Amino acid sequence: MQCYTELLPPSGVTHALAIPFISATAENLVVVKTSVLQIFSLLKVQHHLRGGTIEGKSARPDRVETTKLVLEREYPLSGTVVDICRVKILNPKSGGEALLLAFRNAKLSLVEWDPERHGISTLSIHYYERDDLTRSPWVPDLSSCGSILSVDPSSRCAVFNFGIRNLAILPFHQPGDDLAMDDYEFHLHQDDFNQVSDHVGNDLKSKDRTVYQTPYASSFVLPLTALDPSILHPVSLAFLYEYREPTFGVLYSQIATSHALLPERKDSIFYTVFTLDLEQRASTTLLSVPKLPSDLFKVVALPPPVGGALLIGSNELVHVDQAGKTNAVGVNEFARQVSAFSMVDQSDLALRLEGCVVEHLSDSTGDLLLVLSSGNMVLVHFQLDGRSVSGISLRPLPAQAGGTIMKSAASSSAFLGSGRVFFGSEDADSVLLSWSSMSSNPKKPRPRMSNVAEDREEASVDSQSEEDVYEDDLYTAEPETPALGRRPSAETSGVGVYIFQILDRLPNIGPLRDITLGKPASTVENTGRLIENACSELELIAAQGSGRNGGLVLMKREIEPDVAASFDAQSVQGVWTAVVALGSGAPLVPDEQRINQEYRQYVILSKPEAPDKEQSEVFIADKQDLKPFKAPEFNPNNDVTIEIGTLSCKRRVVQVLRNEVRSYDIDLGLAQIYPVWDEDTSDERMAVSASLADPYIAILRDDSTLMLLQADDSGDLDEVELDDSTRAGKWRSCCLYWDKAEIFSSTVPTSKQRTHCELFLFLLSIDCRLYVYRLPDQQLMSVIEGIDCLPPILSTELPKRSTTREVLSEAVIADLGESWNPSPHLILRTESDDLVIYKAFASSIKGESHTHLSFVKETNHTLPRVTTSDKEMQSNEELSRSRSLRILPNISDLSAVFMPGPSASFILKTAKSCPHVFRLRGEFVRGLSIFDLASPSLDKGFIYVDSKDVLRICRFPSETLFDYTWALRKIGIGEQVDHLAYATSSETYVLGTSHSADFKLPDDDELHPDWRNEVISFLPELRQCSLKVVSPRTWTVIDSYSLGPAEYVMAVKNMDLEVSENTHERRNMIVVGTAFAWGEDIPSRGCIYVFEVIKVVPDPEKPETDRKLKLIGKELVKGAVTALSQIGGQGFLIAAQGQKCMVRGLKEDGSLLPVAFMDMQCYVNVVKELKGTGMCIMGDAVKGLWFAGYSEEPYKMSLFGKDQGYLEVVAAEFLPDGDKLFILVADSDCNLHVLQYDPEDPKSSNGDRLLARSKFHMGHFATTMTLLPRTMVSSEKAMADPDSMEIDSQTISQQVLITSQSGSVGIVTSVPEESYRRLSALQSQLTNSLEHPCGLNPRAYRAVESDGTAGRGMLDGNLLYQWLDMGQHRKMEIAARVGAHEWEIKADLEAIGAEGLGYL
């Protein structure tokens, strides 16, 4: 009984689409990352420049405008997206366009944006998994076939090619169309546009107009052979522009293409254009172009002014216009060998077009940008003669023009207009680019692209004279007689000079190729000032990226700040900081222009002396040190401090105490005392919480009343007279907020034009209503109902189900996000330290001029720690009374909120992510505050004190990404990292890397003398491999060991090997397995290397270079060495070499002596031992999994069991669970299989068969599986009896960490019987009751299978965590159906997540 939980979502972008989605005028980018849907908006941002000149001509402007991506919403999908398209529909809710998504297994989903919910709304889901379409035994399964989705540019219909030759056609209603499907009639007049709705299957006729309930008509499925009987092997299809009826082009062949049969099947591709008659469900062939090159693989429809279609092949580009006229260009020397089609020769470019992505750059010129699989960019230019294309020219972009921005292959692209284009990648970061163009002709300088008509005419005139020479070649219609006019690539006049630069990027850590654990290196010397640095026991390092983008990624489950200094802080309970201006009180200058000497930073520490007394110690920050500051007038009565801040443009320091408010000057001399008691009744009152926003102070008193103070121009405080409702109200929490985004300001119509942001006061009443007041006029802007019901949407309407409510302790309105784009969020804190995050948005209602304030609930699956003792519970209660949420306006250029206590956490958000809760490394944080202006290295840092009486000055770790649920740091290597291992003795990492290199046949081969006569300039590429040593102190390469040509690194492992047969000494070694790949006709060989990372004399300027690889042993073997593992207790290793698995021992002479072996079958890619047991698994890529045992007296390998399903093993790992032994296997279809070795089961034939217990679809292609120990989570510690002996047994549990090519990281956890029953019932309830994005079914997506007897289906942890996102009433309702308490379910959810990895 196991549970699969996705810890990190996929990060590689698979699809991208530009669409006006949120509104009719919005600029949105929709991004798909395998099974995650993200909706971005393009935001124009003003960036600051620090002077300088451009080419010495003119000074730069102070600010420059750039474009950034801002995430609107994110949705995990229960399906794998295979394509996306945009569709114009009738009467969308947002006014924008709809999104059509195609999923694996022949599903289509139509979604639109719902502005009232600030999210997507599913319009329809279409299934095409009918049995009659896939009944043929020779037709492959739908999941094994590719799919193509294309939508007509006028959105009249969509075609979906699934299976092999099945074509689904989905018509859409459009204004003024003449659609008649079956019995449907549609007549629409111009006056009826505002009254058109949707249509589902029956007409609702009323007088002279037809009203539809859905935007689509009935779809139908046709075989492609119904269009043309010769379409037997479809390749690609796409709808074309500038046709009155829906028209698309199909690229296909009548016989299967084959490079091996190229002489017989040369030029076998056809391109045919069909127009659809939706009324008759028929098609008409408009044109057909035969005998096209056999390596064409894609159709790209081109908009005006070029028009037609571009056909992309491995060696050429072919353009076909609407009349069927073709223009082609060959881009390497193989184009003339593989095809007799007429094309212009640009073979000197030597381009490889496999896996390329093409996107048009401008609607005016028709230029295209081609991104190759290497990441290099090529500009494609069409010579236009009026509306006719007279030629194609290509020019690679140089590096100085941005041609090498993409480090690896692109997977998708989107044209965003205004000189912007987006390229998504699965192997590197996805980038948003901007481009500018300049003329390449110095004689005739051309203006920028704004003048469309003149540019197009000039391009035609300039290129006409040159292209006349090649006119005959370009218009030749007989492919049998090639006319290859050779033209150097440099002569591409008419091709403009484009310069690209990066505007923004989406970080990607995929594909994750290998993973290992290592000890974190201390980058700071442990001096007297550094008492203790909180860090994890181990760190998780993964090899990520492809090609030049290869590198490492450091994964941290919690934030480990860079500590600059730490101090002993005995009995310190709180820390505050205050920055004052030392000048004459001039207004603050921007952060970029401030000078440190103009400001002074105070640090105030609070030490309790009695239950109601605290001593305040004042220090001045001097770089990284704290110097005591004498301030006799600062809190002389030792009252308890509630809040400290500054007012009057940082000229006054304000200290809010329980009984009074004290105001000080910049030298902390007392300026004013303002009492907290009620002046009307003279009753003694005490302050409970406070909120500061210059020039106001909002104080909440112990009788739940509000006190509002305002500072005048001189800094003196005076109480603001409140209106009757505010003064008489009983409040639970108060907060002041400057509305920079103007979201709250737009909720009430106003006649005056706002020139600056406004200040708002948020009050949470005792009955949990949120009142929004504008200051200074105290106008009530909005009242949000049912806050404690925690519904998905908070608005002015009371939730329908409001009987069950959560007990809230605090509500805060604060900015979250990056400094250039903070957005307001409502953060609610419950009594149990649960954090609920809402994002504010303004929803518009038709017929009203102003908008309404609403809040949408953000996902937060981080559970608070459960306290384990009465002492901790008591300290937690004291903290909750005195220490509230801390608002951090700017910490490392991020606006954040911090929650102190046992679950000390930051709430962080970047522009490209949702809010995430990151734990601060450590157990208990008493107080935290911003620490700024000390030194450049500590700018925008923070200072905090923990339960170990340590005060630390630190900042967020540098170069760390907070876009995901874990803190990530990417380290570039510049080469693809295929394997890595941690050398424990030297505390370094050894990488197996590779880079592309040209391959040439050896001239000295005696068996093949004909190789010497080969004349070729376009050489094939192979991977040149090497070993590198990386120091974790600086994350730089300190040593390298190159391997021979055609020798590939297949495995790198760290092992504790016996190095002497006489002394039996054992040392830590790095074992490397390689394979020599000389070609399929030459038997493969391999080699086993044994290295030791030794200590050497370092470079004085580089002290980290004190380690080097030393070759200890080397053994050439027959067959490729594909997998390695340590085995047994004598320091031996087991290697998969060819079709054998052999146990070897290292001899003193460096050779590896075989002692035992086992015959395998095809290709062994997994060999692992359950450490210390001698039991091992061997996974074959084709023939399944073997479970064997190794014995040392005598040396032999024994087969215990084998799976009977012939699984295609991609990765495998043991998973012990008590007295049961499970084996997890990931196959090539993204499935996870659970096998069990149980010789007592009759079905196992005395253990000869591994029993298949369950099957689970992960949705991601697994790359590694790693068995990790599991630590007890806080709920298990709290429930465990300290005197019980079961504590030790609970800690002996394991988890399996799974990485994938998409960048996702998952974990499989064994679940006890009682918890499994609860979670299984909860999963069934959530599957049936939740509204799933795009209408998908999680149960069908996971395709959970089990043997039905002893086996249980695997649980979906991500689906279970959605229970936390529900409203309080529904949450309790489902818990009651499951028959469990809320704390039981939370404890179960904590156990299946990442909390069990307490050492990371």
From Swiss-Prot:
InterPro entries: Beta-prop_RSE1/DDB1/CPSF1_1st, Cleavage/polyA-sp_fac_asu_C, RSE1/DDB1/CFT1/CPSF1, WD40/YVTN_repeat-like_dom_sf. It is found in: Nucleus. One of its GO terms (molecular function) is RNA binding. GO terms for cellular component: nucleus. Pfam families: Beta-prop_RSE1_1st, CPSF_A. GO terms for biological process: mRNA processing. Keywords: mRNA processing, Nucleus, RNA-binding. Transmembrane segments: none annotated. Residues 436-472 are annotated as: Disordered. Gene3D superfamilies: 1.10.150.910, YVTN repeat-like/Quinoprotein amine dehydrogenase. It comes from the Eukaryota. Signal peptide: none annotated. RNA-binding component of the cleavage and polyadenylation factor (CPF) complex, which plays a key role in polyadenylation-dependent pre-mRNA 3'-end formation and cooperates with cleavage factors including the CFIA complex and NAB4/CFIB. Involved in poly(A) site recognition. May be involved in coupling transcription termination and mRNA 3'-end formation. Belongs to the CFT1 family. This is Protein cft1. It comes from Neosartorya fischeri (strain ATCC 1020 / DSM 3700 / CBS 544.65 / FGSC A1164 / JCM 1740 / NRRL 181 / WB 181) (Aspergillus fischerianus). The lineage of its organism: Eukaryota, Fungi, Dikarya, Ascomycota, Pezizomycotina.
